[in-house]
C-alpha cells in the first residue's frame, strides 16, 4: 500500500508537510517486511563515514523490539533500528556479530502516532561524539563512533522476516544508505523533496509502493 500523503519536508520545526513522492506502508503482519540480500555496499563495518536516513509514520502501537529497519540474522547480529512499547526508538548494534548487543542507544523517546518524522543516523569519523542521531534535523543523541559487524545478513525494512512479532505498523519513505560519506554533521533542515542519489549512495528505496 501507498500512503496518500507521503513526506518530503517540514513546516517550522515540528511537523513534516504533505509529500507526494511515495512510501511503503507495512501493516504489522508477520512476514511482510521488505528484505534485501546482503552485498558489500551496505555492510557498514568499520567504515568511518556513513548515513542511514528515512521518513517514518507510525500507524499503530509498537511492541518491544519491533524492527523498523536493520541488518542481520537470528544468529549473527549487525545493526537494527527498533521501536518499543513505550513509543521510543533505539539503535542496537553488534561489533563482533554475536547475539549480545555491543550497544543500544535511544534515538527518540516517543514516536507519536500518525505523524511523519525524518530520522538520520550518522557516523562522521572516529572518536568521541562522532556518531550522532537526528530527528527532524535536530540532534537527539551523540556518542563515540562505533564499528558494526560486517556480516552477510539480510537487510530488513518495515519488520523482520526472521522471527514473529517484530513487525511494526509503520510507513517508510525515502530510505537511504550512504556508505562512505556523512550527509549531515550538524543540525539541519530536513529534506523538502524526495531524497536523491548523492555521492556514495548504496541504497535508495521506498519512494513508491512498487
Give residue ranges: language-model regions.
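Extended recognition patches within non-cytosolic domains
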Residues: 1-29, 132, 138-141, 172-210
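Short hydrophobic/aromatic patches on beta-strands that form ligand-binding or substrate-lining surfaces
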Residues: 51-60, 69, 119-121, 157, ...
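Short, aromatic/His-centered strand-loop micro-motif at the edge of beta-sheets
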Residues: 92-118
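Short surface loop/edge beta-strand patches of beta-sandwich-type extracellular domains
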Residues: 27-50, 72, 102-110, 161-164, ...
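Surface-exposed loop/edge segments in extracytoplasmic proteins
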Residues: 77-78, 99-104, 138-143
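Extracellular repetitive beta-rich solenoid segments
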Residues: 74-75, 112-115, 127, 196-201
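Extracellular glycan-interaction patches encoded by glycine-rich segments
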Residues: 71, 96, 151-173
Amino acid at each position: 500500500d501507498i500512503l496518500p500523503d507521503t513526506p518530503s519536508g517540514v513546516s517550522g520545526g515540528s511537523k513534516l508537510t504533505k509529500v507526494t513522492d511515495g512510501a511503503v506502508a507495512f501493516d504489522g503482519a508477520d512476514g511482510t517486511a521488505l528484505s534485501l540480500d546482503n552485498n558489500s555496499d551496505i555492510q557498514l563495518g568499520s567504515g568511518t563515514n556513513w548515513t542511514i536516513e528515512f521518513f517514518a509514520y507510525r500507524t499503530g502501537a509498537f511492541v518491544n523490539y519491533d524492527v523498523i529497519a536493520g541488518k542481520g540474522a537470528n544468529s549473527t547480529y549487525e545493526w537494527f533500528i527498533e521501536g518499543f512499547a513505550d513509543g521510543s526508538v533505539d539503535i542496537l548494534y553488534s561489533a563482533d556479530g554475536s547475539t549480545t548487543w555491543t550497544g543500544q542507544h535511544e534515538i527518540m523517546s516517543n514516536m507519536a502516532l500518525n505523524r511523519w518524522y525524518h530520522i538520520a543516523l550518522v557516523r562522521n569519523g572516529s572518536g568521541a561524539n562522532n556518531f550522532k542521531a537526528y530527528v527532524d534535523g535536530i540532534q537527539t543523541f551523540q556518542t563515540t563512533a562505533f564499528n558494526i559487524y560486517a556480516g552477510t545478513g539480510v537487510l530488513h525494512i518495515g519488520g523482520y522476516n526472521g522471527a514473529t512479532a517484530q513487525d511494526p505498523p509503520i510507513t517508510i519513505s525515502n530510505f537511504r544508505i550512504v556508505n562512505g560519506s556523512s550527509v549531515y554533521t550538524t543540525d539541519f533542515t530536513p529534506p523538502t523533496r524526495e531524497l536523491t542519489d548523492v555521492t556514495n549512495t548504496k541504497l535508495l528505496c521506498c519512494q513508491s509502493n512498487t
